[in-house]
């Protein structure tokens, strides 16, 4: 029955009936494609490495989704996997069972119980017949598509090698999903699908496209990610209705001037190719809102980029850019600009016109300064990342440049001081990373950073901490490793919200008794210092799970360590004076890892030590004078 001609909602089909499909793999980038629709929507993977942009295609009953990708210019790699959208799907496994039930006995997969190694050997014909069976299934799916007037067809992840010419009969199709197959070329008959609006061909082996594709004059979304294209197929330049074009992860080396014909494009991804030049044609794409040309070999941008006045996300990271044109200042709608890991020594002062930007990230360049007052002009900034450059001082512009900022990263530069009062207006500043600089002291007004939550001052030359650090009562993470600190002020006990305290590789000899007041502390890292004893108050750290005191001068552990019931990891290795462990350590029932290497423990037999934490704890318990209690 033809559902379309009868007035019913157009159906959707796939090789696994109407069930759910997951999108292909993604590796970041401002892209989203493929399936989804209706009440479902295309799912997939998301990662933090490109402009936030996702496309969900339209369908009646939901269904399979291509990969959905999001990029952020910050150096973050946290990922989350989302499932492919499905309108009324019960999941892939249920589909599999349903399909098995409806397949003829001769093609139904068999359940095999392995009794002998020989029975697990695959049949010689199994692998050879799979592509043939897949291609036969395609023929059946196309017949059904033709007979029922189906508008949405999902043949993704089906091991298809060839699309038969009978595809021309599926003239009702508006969406065709062929991603994650083994297709080397498309038949010319694909051009007969004149109603096609969405075509997903990502994750195949395409090297070209047929010229007949130009007949698909309603095509809006074309996904060609992860193929083997050495150039942008010429026919693409004639698809003037395209609004979204994904060409990520191919082998493209150049962009033809004909690109200017695609004036309706709003999203263009050329990420992860081999492009060395982006011509002036890019300036004709005045409707672009997202442009991703990251991970290429660009050294320059054309001035014409300034004509793309609707751009909100421009990702240029991981190229070889030597400069940015002044015309970048015309992009007043720009929210995110990715410039990480290029070869920039400066950025144009005109960037101060891009007042919609909420993030400024130039990590991994060769910059020594920013234009005067530029950051202050970008009053909407909330995140500033200047790490891994050659800055010797804070940018000029005074406190005004950090008014609305909550995160500042200046890691791995050559800055020797934090100016007094520089954060006096930064009432929302919660995260400051000054790791790997040349700081010798902290500013006297550090006590005014009252909203700070995370402070990283590792790998500097700090010799002391000011007493005013006690005012940072919202601080949860304090990293002071690899400095020259000899002591910790008693006032540290006022920082009651601390969860992580890292003091590794300093010159500390004594810990203050007040450290026992840090009841929220979960990780205490003290390794590579000169500590001779731990304060008895350490037993009050009821939330401590990780304690590292290796490479010190400990003579003993306090009995109170037995109160750390939540302790999971204890590092006391390489303490040459530590000859015995307290029996109370056996009370740490959750201890999973105990490192006692290179400690001259004379009381515990070597074979017990070699047996791991549980055996050591058992031995301590058995030999404890309190064991009868």
Curated annotation (Swiss-Prot):
Record keywords, A-Z: Leucine-rich repeat, Repeat
SMART domains membership: LRR_BAC, LRR_SD22, LRR_TYP
InterPro entries: Leu-rich_rpt, Leu-rich_rpt_typical-subtyp, LRR-SigEffector_domain, LRR_dom_sf, LRR_R13L4/SHOC2-like
Keyword Repeat applies: yes
Biased segments, Low complexity type: 1-19
LRR repeats: 149-170, 172-193, 195-217, 218-239, 241-262, 264-285, 287-308, 310-331, 333-355, 356-377, 380-401, 404-425, 428-449, 451-472, 474-495, 497-518, 520-541, 543-564, 566-588, 590-611
Region (Disordered): 1-133
Compositional bias annotation for Gly residues: 21-45
Protein family per UniProt: Belongs to the SHOC2 family.
Role noted for this protein: Acts as a Ras effector and participates in MAPK pathway activation. Probably acts as a regulatory subunit of protein phosphatase that specifically dephosphorylates Raf kinase and stimulate Raf activity at specialized signaling complexes upon Ras activation.
Descriptive protein name: Leucine-rich repeat protein soc-2 homolog
Gene that encodes it: Sur-8
